C-alpha cells in the first residue's frame, strides 16, 4: 500500500498516521494538521477494488522541524472517538512484523471470529482482514498482525491444523510484499527487538521530560507563564468523534451566508416576475376594455344611421333669437298673430285698460 506513494516526497518531513477510522478523509487530515504547521500534501493509500483505506495515512510538511512540532502537538488526538497513532516515517523502512497467514477458512468465518479466536495469544495491531471477492464472498484466507513474535509463535503452535467452523485451518507466517521470503526469520526478530528497545527508551525519555516540564511550570515566573500561554495550543478535541475548529466553523458560516444571499436573490427575482406578470395583466385588461368600447361604439353607429353625416360639414352657430335652419331639421313655422287665442282672464279687472290721458 505504501508503494503507491510518490517517491519525490521528503521523508524527513513526513509523518505516518495509523489507526484511522474508515470515515477519515484526506481533506479532514489536511484541515487537522494545517493547524499545527504548513502541510504540503496528504496521502491515504486505498485498495484498488474496494476504494477503502486500511487506517494509515501520510502527511508531508514543509520541513522536518514542522513535522516534529506537529508530532508533539497532535499526540492523543481522537478522530471519531478513536485515538490516532502518529510517528515519523523511516525512509529505510523494512517490511518487518509478526504477520500471519490463515488459510483453508470456512465461508462462515469472518473478522470477528478471527479476532475473538486469536486475540488470546497477544495484542492484534490491525483488525484481521478476510480476503473477499467482488461479491463479498470469502476467498478462504486471511491475515493477522500481532505486535510481537512471541504472540505469533504461540498462535501458530496452538491453532495450526485446528478446526474452525468445521474446517481445519493452516496458520503460518505470511510472505513479504517485495520478496518470496516469509516473516519470522531470525534477522527480522533481531531488528524488531532493537526497535522495541528504542521505542521503550523514547517513551521513558518522554515521561521524564513531561515530569520535568510539570515541575518547571510550577516554579516558573509570571513572565515565563505568559510566554507559555502565548504558544500555539493543540486543536480542540470532541470526545463524541470528529474535531471542530475555527476553519470548519468559518466555512459553515460562509456557506450559510451564501445560501441566505442566494435565497434573497431568488426572492427578489420572484417579486420582479410577479410585478411583470401583474403589469402584463393590467395591460391586457386595458386592451380588452378599449376593444369593448370600440365594439359598443360600432354597434351604436349601426343602430342609428341617421346620426351619421355622409359628408362632413361644419355646423353654423345658432342665432340668438331663433335657431338656424339645419338640413336635417325643418325650420319652425312663421309667427301668425291671428292664431293666438284671446283670454280675458289674462286682462286686468274692469276690462280693457283706459287710454292714456291727453296732454
Curated annotation (Swiss-Prot):
Keywords: mRNA processing, mRNA splicing, Nucleus, Repeat, RNA-binding, Spliceosome. Residues 202-231, 293-302 have a biased composition (Low complexity). It is found in: Nucleus. It comes from Dictyostelium discoideum. This is Splicing factor 3B subunit 4. Residues 198-239, 293-337 are annotated as: Disordered. Residues 303-312 have a biased composition (Basic residues). InterPro entries: Nucleotide-bd_a/b_plait_sf, RBD_domain_sf, RRM_dom, SF3B4_RRM1, SF3B4_RRM2, SF3B4_spliceosome_assoc. GO terms for biological process: mRNA splicing, via spliceosome. Subunit of the splicing factor SF3B required for 'A' complex assembly formed by the stable binding of U2 snRNP to the branchpoint sequence (BPS) in pre-mRNA. Sequence independent binding of SF3A/SF3B complex upstream of the branch site is essential, it may anchor U2 snRNP to the pre-mRNA. May also be involved in the assembly of the 'E' complex. Has been found in complex 'B' and 'C' as well. Belongs to the SF3B4 family. Residues 13-91, 98-176 form the RRM domain.
